Every structure is written in C-alpha cells, then in structure tokens.
C-alpha cells in the first residue's frame, strides 16, 4: 500500500460518477460521489474544455489530492474567438478579434502553467500566442498591443484584475 495515481480526462465541471472514473475510485475505497464533486469544483473554471486530472491517492489514509492541467493557451484562444483551428497564415489571414480584457482573463486562467511572475508578463505571453495563431486584439496586431502594454497604456485595466491574479 502506498500512493496511487489515477489520470483521467474530464470536461471542466462535468465529471460524472460513471466509468472510467467511478470503478477506479471505488477500487481504492473512496466515496465516488465526493471525489467527483471535488473534481468538478477543481475543474469548474475550465467549463467547456476537456482537461487532464491527476488524482493522487494515499491508499493507507484514503486522503487524496487533485491536480488539474489547464487547457492549452491555443485552445483557450480558439474557443474565445469561436474558431476550430489556428490560421495557416497568421500574418495575413486573421481568424478573429478579442477584447484586451479577454486576453487578461486567459492569462489568469493560465497562471499555474506560465512562468510569468506578473500579470503584465503573463498578458504579454498570451498576446504572443494570439499573434501566432492569427488573432487580433481590439482590432490591432497583438505585437502593437504588447508595445502599448509596455508603455503603460493598459495599466488601469491590468490593475482591475491584479487581485484576481494574486488569488489564481
């Protein structure tokens, strides 16, 4: 008896106490409904996305930990613009436009997997991804928006989200 790990993919906030999840949880002697409820709480902010969940169970104490791997930045950006795939020619063929605040929201969602220390740095990372798949921001090339972020033009917007960034 030791540590067991169960890896499973679920739709954010929509895990069900059914196969393949339920039998694996039952076999470890855990309350299936409670674990599924906890998984749904942990994945709620990724509603509409398929996310990888790692359930780490101590077989001796029956205590468990849930780790959620967020969707990729590309998946989040594509869903935000309603596109199914990136542009094959992002410099000339745009697939959509997003408001700057949506970029900030995606940066906050991605905080656990980004190496950015500040919200501003995280936003610049997401802007780079948006540019590489053919998305404009507020009708502008994300490279221009990145320059404007560096110049402080978006400081007021970023300040509104700072508390949310700290909690993420």
From Swiss-Prot:
What is a single cellular component term in the Gene Ontology annotation?
A: large ribosomal subunit
Q: Which domain of life is it from?
A: Archaea
Pfam families, alphabetized? Ribosomal_L11, Ribosomal_L11_N
Annotated TM spans: none
Would you kindly state one Gene Ontology biological process term found in this protein's UniProt entry? translation
GO function term, MF aspect, one: structural constituent of ribosome
SMART domains the record matches: RL11
Which InterPro entries does the entry mention?
Ribosomal_uL11 (IPR000911), Ribosomal_uL11_C (IPR020783), Ribosomal_uL11_C_sf (IPR036769), Ribosomal_uL11_CS (IPR020785), Ribosomal_uL11_N (IPR020784), Ribosomal_uL11_N_sf (IPR036796)
Keywords of this entry: Ribonucleoprotein, Ribosomal protein, RNA-binding, rRNA-binding
Q: Does the keyword RNA-binding apply?
A: yes
What does it do? Forms part of the ribosomal stalk which helps the ribosome interact with GTP-bound translation factors.
Instruction: State the family named in the UniProt similarity comment for this chain.
Output: Belongs to the universal ribosomal protein uL11 family.
Q: How does it assemble?
A: Part of the ribosomal stalk of the 50S ribosomal subunit. Interacts with L10 and the large rRNA to form the base of the stalk. L10 forms an elongated spine to which L12 dimers bind in a sequential fashion forming a multimeric L10(L12)X complex.
* Full protein name: Large ribosomal subunit protein uL11
Species per Swiss-Prot/TrEMBL record: Hyperthermus butylicus (strain DSM 5456 / JCM 9403 / PLM1-5)
